[in-house]
């Protein structure tokens, strides 16, 4: 009996230390990535390991980090128009969007709607595994609060654009621009930026190089939203250019 208690005690001791260690690593990551390029994300690691485990050794999760100054302003505008139009104003969470999503999901459980902001998407893509669970969501809330506290909005947007998945093995806007349009991210047009943003809900299902009718329709909607937000002036007014 004593040995069993001792075993549980040791398990609790090392488990607690492990959790503290992981939290410390996350905190260090938030501080380091406030200034340095993010070399890879948890999503990239998950995709790469998944490919290897299924025998796809040709798969390479590819990303090329570029600063915001080397990204077309249309791209930053497009992702905000598509994913999070209140990004400059909220503190990491869009309460109105969350309430709307909860109401929708209660009425229609077959088509679940999300309400993640760009800040939340950045936090979970960099630091967390893919999937849906209350544990993961709780960790996402804490990490989102952390990056909102330490990083500027411009930094969050920069990291997001450099780690977002735009296709199979294609991460970050620089890799996407060169793969799909044979040009650097700095040269993307409004239409090209809107097309890239249009596939973000599910880049493994929706294709930039073979857009479905839905993707084209979403691209046109994003272009209209970019105009309604105020175009490049919107970025300048919120110090995001």
UniProtKB/Swiss-Prot annotation:
GO biological process terms, alphabetically, are:
cell wall organization; peptidoglycan biosynthetic process; regulation of cell shape
Q: How does it sit in the membrane?
A: Single-pass membrane protein
What is the reaction catalyzed? [GlcNAc-(1->4)-Mur2Ac(oyl-L-Ala-gamma-D-Glu-L-Lys-D-Ala-D-Ala)](n)-di-trans,octa-cis-undecaprenyl diphosphate + beta-D-GlcNAc-(1->4)-Mur2Ac(oyl-L-Ala-gamma-D-Glu-L-Lys-D-Ala-D-Ala)-di-trans,octa-cis-undecaprenyl diphosphate = [GlcNAc-(1->4)-Mur2Ac(oyl-L-Ala-gamma-D-Glu-L-Lys-D-Ala-D-Ala)](n+1)-di-trans,octa-cis-undecaprenyl diphosphate + di-trans,octa-cis-undecaprenyl diphosphate + H(+)
UniProt-listed Enzyme Commission number(s): 2.4.99.28
Keywords attached to this Swiss-Prot or TrEMBL record, sorted alphabetically, are:
Cell inner membrane, Cell membrane, Cell shape, Cell wall biogenesis/degradation, Glycosyltransferase, Membrane, Peptidoglycan synthesis, Transferase, Transmembrane, Transmembrane helix
Cited Pfam families: Transgly
Against InterPro entries, the record matches this protein to:
Glyco_trans_51 (IPR001264), Lysozyme-like_dom_sf (IPR023346), PBP_transglycosylase (IPR036950), Pep_trsgly (IPR011812)
Which pathway, metabolic or otherwise, does it act in? Cell wall biogenesis; peptidoglycan biosynthesis
Gene Ontology annotations for the cellular component aspect, listed alphabetically: peptidoglycan-based cell wall; plasma membrane
Membrane-spanning ranges: 18-38
Q: Which GO terms describe its molecular function?
A: pentosyltransferase activity; peptidoglycan glycosyltransferase activity
The record's subcellular locations are: Cell inner membrane
Main function: Peptidoglycan polymerase that catalyzes glycan chain elongation from lipid-linked precursors.
Identify the NCBIfam families for this entry: mono_pep_trsgly (TIGR02070)
Family of this protein? Belongs to the glycosyltransferase 51 family.
- The name this protein goes by in its record: Biosynthetic peptidoglycan transglycosylase
**Organism, per UniProt?**
Yersinia pestis
Q: What is the lineage of its organism?
A: Bacteria, Pseudomonadati, Pseudomonadota, Gammaproteobacteria, Enterobacterales
Gene behind this chain?
Answer: mtgA
């Amino acid at each position: 009996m004593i040995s069993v208690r001792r075993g549980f005690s040791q398990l609790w001791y090392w488990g607690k230390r492990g959790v503290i260690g992981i939290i410390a690593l996350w905190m260090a990551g938030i501080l380091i990535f406030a200034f340095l390029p993010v070399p890879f994300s948890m999503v990239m690691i998950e995709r790469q390991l998944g490919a290897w485990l299924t025998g796809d050794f040709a798969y390479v999760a590819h990303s090329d980090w570029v600063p915001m100054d080397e990204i077309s302003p249309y791209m930053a505008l497009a992702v905000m128009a598509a994913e999070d139009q209140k990004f400059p104003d909220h503190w990491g969470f869009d309460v109105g969007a969350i309430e709307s999503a909860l109401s929708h999901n209660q009425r229609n459980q077959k088509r679940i709607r999300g309400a993640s902001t760009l800040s939340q998407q950045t936090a979970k893509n960099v630091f967390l595994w893919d999937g849906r669970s209350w544990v993961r969501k709780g960790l996402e809330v804490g990490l989102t609060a952390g990056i909102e506290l330490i990083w500027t909005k411009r930094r969050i947007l920069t990291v997001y654009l450099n780690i977002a998945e735009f296709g199979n093995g294609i991460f970050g806007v620089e890799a996407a621009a060169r793969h799909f349009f044979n040009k650097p991210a700095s040269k993307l047009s409004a239409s090209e930026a809107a097309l890239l943003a249009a596939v973000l809900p599910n880049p493994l299902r929706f294709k930039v190089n073979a857009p479905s009718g839905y993707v084209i329709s979403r691209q046109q909607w994003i272009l209209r939203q970019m105009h309604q937000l105020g175009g490049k002036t919107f970025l300048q007014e919120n110090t995001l250019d």
